[in-house]
Amino acid sequence: MRAFAAVALLLAACTQPQVANVTVTAMRASPPVAHGRVAEVTFHSRALDVDKRYFVYLPAGYGTLPRRFPVVYLLHGLGGDERDWIDQGHLPEAADRIGLAAMVVMPDGDESFYVNSVTPADYANCVKLARHDFAGRRETAASFCVRHADYETYVARDLVDDVDARFRTVATRQARGIAGLSMGGFGALMLAMRHLDRFSAAASHSGLDALLYAGPHPYRKGHVQLATDVSRWGAEVEPIGALVRRIFGPDVASFRAHDPAALATTLSDGQLAIYLDCGTEDNFGLEDEAAYLHDVLASR
């Protein structure tokens, strides 16, 4: 599956450690690396009712070959923005290094968890405060504040439609994958599982893969506890918990409707290609959620 191969290769390349101060003696010259380029786009999202910016990596052959290209959507984590994968993930260099023959779209997800929030946006107050708990240092009110907090619709509909209209894409689900880090890993799985007409592959790197997973820590198969009361969800990691509760609301059904581990039980065999990983030094128990989701998928 083209989209899955692109997602897995790209995520591995962007998240592998950078090696410095290493001397290598070349035995023979390596072929030159073909370089892609990064384009910056601003468009109006109907779902958010504001203008949003995204970056798109165009592979080396985009300017010379008449063909169309598959697309990977790459989502940033909490506190990040649309430049994170370029500045910190070194996306262009990683994509060039593996010869990625796909476009990579990096949108601005603010602190939304890529969900249509149950709490309405307060645009006027957001602009007035001009300060946001998790917004990156580059964020201004103009780039952060929205009139409607419908981020799921913004990514799955507005963004995908704009990219397909603006660039030479293969505009089918089979040629679209979505991946992300942390909040973005959750967003990638959730969006792909809830919009199977849009995406055929999803990848989560240290993501919130099971919103309602309540233990044990470490994970033990067959002993899983799932939360039934979300009134204090994430209380041990405030203010992140308060943000998530504001987005999903007080109803456990809202959490369950967006929980990748719950959504995974509805998938048919071969319906969605999925890649999961998590760092060994994670401090939020996310590796337990990844292990649980893996077993949910394996047991279907």
Model-derived regions: residue spans:
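Sec-dependent signal peptide recognition
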Residues: M1-V7
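Short, surface-exposed beta-edge/turn micro-motifs
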Residues: V7-A8, A101
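C-terminal motif of bacterial Sec signal peptides marking the signal peptidase cleavage site
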Residues: L11-A13
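Non-catalytic cap/lid and distal C-terminal segments of serine-dependent acyl enzymes
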Residues: T15-R300
